[in-house]
Each structure stands twice: as C-alpha cells, then as structure tokens.
C-alpha cells in the first residue's frame, strides 16, 4: 500500500468528524505548530464561502522610521518595529529589516493576516500612511503576496505552480523589467523547471531545490500554510497592490479545479480575470512597453 503524502494526511485529519479542538490536537501531534493548525482549520471553516480567502503582503520600501510611525497613528494603523523575523501575527503591521533592499532607510512592511472580507480597507490605510510618510521604492524592492492555501490537495498545490508557469510570459509583460524572466535573483523564473511529473508539495520542493527565491515560493506552505507570490516590483500604490492580490487569489482558486494545458498567449485569454481586471493589467503592460 502506498504511503500517504503529507498533504493527504493533513486532509484526512481536517475532514474527519472529530471536533475542531480534537483536529487541532491531531495536527499538532502530526508536527504542525498551533498557529499552522489554526490556519488550516480556519480555512476549512470558511471554505463554504468560495470567495473568502486570507492574504498577507510584504511591502519593501524606503521610509524614515519616525515619520511613518507618526503617519501610522494618523491613519489608525497598528505597527511595530521588530528585528528580522518570520513570525506571523493577526493584529498589526510589523516593520522589519531587509538586507536585500538598497538605499537609505530600507524596511519591509509585513501585514498581519488579512481577510478578503475587510482586509483591503486595512491595507489601504497602511498604503496611505506609507505614502504620506514619503515612502519610496526602487529596483531592489519587491512586493510579496501570501494567499491562504492550507486547504489545497497535492494536485491543487501543483496546479498553482504549473498554471503560473503557463502564465508567466504574459505576467512578465505587466511587471517591471527588473522582475521579468530571471532578471532578479530573489524571484527566478519557473520556465526552466519541469513540473509535469509533480504530484504533491514535496515533488515541487525537490524541483526547486527547496529554495524560496522563485516567482512563486514553494517553501511558504510548510511554514505559513500559504502560497507566496514574489514577482511583483516594489509598490506602495493601493490599487496596484490590491489588484495583484486579487490576481494571485483568483489564480489559487482557479487552480483548485483547473490545470492549464498550454501557455496563455494574452492577458485577454487569462480565464479567471474579469473584463475590468483584464483592462487594468493591459494598461500596466502598455505602460511598461512604452517605458
């Protein structure tokens, strides 16, 4: 009898008839942290609402500490300055150091876990505070988006990477040149990797050499129960950030039931976008084509 994968065993616990408390204890015994178990069970409890999801953003930028602290208070944005860490939280935006950012006053603004049902307002307030504080971005800064994905099966998880690979050439058209192809060592292309034989998370991890520095990070699932999208250039513009968050969330949702069989040839052919969203990304592609 074939040994069940990690994802299959987690799914078995999650879908059992036991109480939520019993499921949490079982997940912790299985090796997950209390936080990871909470995320998995939270996603399970809201999955009946197909449009609901959790997300988080990491905004790399340059901004003076004292100024942004004052502006955060004005916009009622809870913040905390911390050293470099990967701890998740549900209550405040944390500012951490990031050695990859070049320039004066480099910082990474990491959001708390946000919900699609209300989280965008909190994100907009944070962007307003950053912009009022004079935050700037450059070629060394990026925007990382995490989408809650703890309820994905192995097949669905693989689909996210395969589908992004099928979309990557089109996504490159509405990204800055510094984030296209493999122009950035912190978000390398997926196009050179063979994913066709992947069946679960561990197969994908092996293909990517267990490195997180790809346009889609295969390592964040184990640590956070998320899929991390790393390609977007640095930005403090709420519209650009929120549209990319929604793109990533829709890609994850699409991947639950679909695997693209060939490369997508244009933005207008991306199957999960609305006409309004296609218009936005076409506008971004035109901007980069002319600059």
Predicted regions and their residues:
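Aromatic/basic-lined ligand-recognition segments
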Residues: 56, 97, 155-235
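Helical (often loop-to-helix) elements that flank the catalytic cores of nucleotide-handling enzymes
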Residues: 69, 116-127, 150-176, 237-252, ...
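Histidine-centered divalent-metal-coordination microenvironment in nucleic-acid enzymes
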Residues: 106, 136-152, 224-230
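Flexible helix-coil linker/hinge segments at domain or subdomain boundaries
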Residues: 136, 169-183, 253-279
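Beta-strand-rich recognition/accessory modules
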Residues: 212, 223-262
């Amino acid at each position: 009898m074939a040994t069940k994968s990690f994802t299959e065993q987690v799914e078995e616990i999650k879908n059992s008839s036991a109480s939520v408390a019993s499921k949490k204890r079982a997940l912790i015994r299985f090796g997950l942290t209390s936080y990871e178990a909470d995320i998995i069970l939270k996603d399970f409890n809201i999955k009946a609402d197909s449009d609901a999801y959790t997300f988080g953003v990491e905004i790399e930028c340059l901004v003076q500490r004292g100024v942004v602290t004052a502006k955060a208070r004005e916009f009622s944005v809870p913040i905390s300055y911390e050293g470099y860490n990967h701890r998740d939280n549900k209550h405040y935006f944390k500012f951490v150091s990031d050695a990859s950012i070049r320039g004066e006053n480099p910082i990474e603004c990491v959001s708390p876990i946000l919900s699609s049902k209300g989280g965008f307002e909190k994100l907009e307030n944070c962007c307003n505070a950053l912009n009022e504080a004079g935050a700037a971005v450059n070629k060394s800064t990026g925007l990382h988006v995490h989408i809650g994905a703890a309820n994905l099966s192995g097949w669905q998880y693989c689909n996210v990477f395969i589908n992004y690979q099928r979309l990557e050439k089109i996504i490159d058209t509405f990204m800055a040149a510094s984030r296209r192809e493999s122009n950035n060592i912190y978000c390398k292309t997926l196009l050179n990797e063979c994913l066709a034989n992947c069946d679960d998370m561990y197969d994908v991890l092996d293909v990517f050499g267990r490195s997180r520095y790809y346009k889609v990070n295969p390592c964040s699932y184990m640590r956070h129960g998320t899929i991390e999208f790393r390609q977007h250039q640095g930005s403090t513009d709420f519209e650009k950030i929120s549209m990319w968050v929604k793109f990533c969330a829709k890609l994850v949702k699409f991947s639950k039931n679909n695997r693209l069989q060939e490369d997508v040839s244009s933005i207008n052919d991306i199957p999960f976008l609305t006409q309004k969203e296609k218009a936005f990304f076409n506008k971004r592609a035109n901007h980069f084509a002319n600059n």
